[in-house]
Amino acid sequence: MRGKCLYRLGAGIAFFLAAVACSLFVSPAAWSADTPVPADSRLKTIAAKKVIRIAYRADARPFAFLNDNKEPLGYTIDLCQQVVKSIQEQFKLPELKIEWVPVTVETRFSAVATGKADMECGSSTVTLSRMKEIDFSNLVFVESTGVLVASNSDIHSFADLAGKKIAVVSGTTNEKVVKEHLKLRNLNATVVTVKDRDEAVAALEAGKVDGFASDKLLLAGAQVKHPEALAMLPDDLSIEQYAIVLPRGDWAFRLAVNTGLAQFFRAGKTNDLFERWFFGSRPGLLLEALYALGRISD
């Protein structure tokens, strides 16, 4: 039905995709005192200063955003806070404070790569090209690209966007996906790049564009604010795999982060986390498979 997001996949499809996803997980060997931390690892600075710098975006609701008190909140923010607690315990630190570093969709990767932040927690999709600059943790979410339109429009599927204007946030995987689908389906539409999701939603509501393509749950976060004005198309244009952004080549830090994630997934609290941030719903079969794969043993 138009305007509703369906995240549950058939069992056969979910099983197949889960098998593929299995290759994307790296098992965190148990950390021990006998495993020395390399001198150039971010862990050295984190342990010395007892501060870990986490980059976040304010426009990635419900994965990362600011509340009325200007405090970072969201699904991935919660996960990263659990990881920080784990790192503190892994290295027996008396305290480990979080320094929040605001970033944009354009600066999120460079902030980690240049050392302004130790990790980025939001809605960043894993791609091979991005691994040339930064690294990723094990997967924390699986999503798909969708399109939001005005509820009173005559657009009912992606094919109806022929001859229309589609907004995408510049530099996102969604931009690439939309262009690929337009070419694949031989559709002539104009792709309009914007700086962030707020600008895209404003353009859609003002009639400056006919659709806004992004990750479906991010679109749902915008739709819930304007339930009567906006509708979600049924098309799934791609599978987006989210992870925490980490410094490239820092295996020790990545191991510590993945250990924290594995501990959280094994604790069996993933459904509570999902329900908190995704409108009280339950994770679909594919996401449940991801959570199961994330319960890596020490």
PLM regions with names:
Residues 81, 85, 92-160, 230-231, ...:
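Acidic, polar ligand-binding/catalytic clefts
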Residues 33-37, 43, 74-86, 152, ...:
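Extended ligand-binding regions for polar small-molecule ligands
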Residues 58, 141-152, 198, 216, ...:
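Periplasmic-binding protein-like
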Residues 33-37, 173-192, 227-232, 262-298:
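Ligand-binding clefts/hinges and TM-proximal coupling segments of bilobed small-molecule sensing domains
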Residues 12-27:
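Bacterial N-terminal signal peptides
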Residues 58-62, 72-89, 125-128, 143-197, ...:
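Bilobed "Venus flytrap"/periplasmic-binding protein-like clamshell domains
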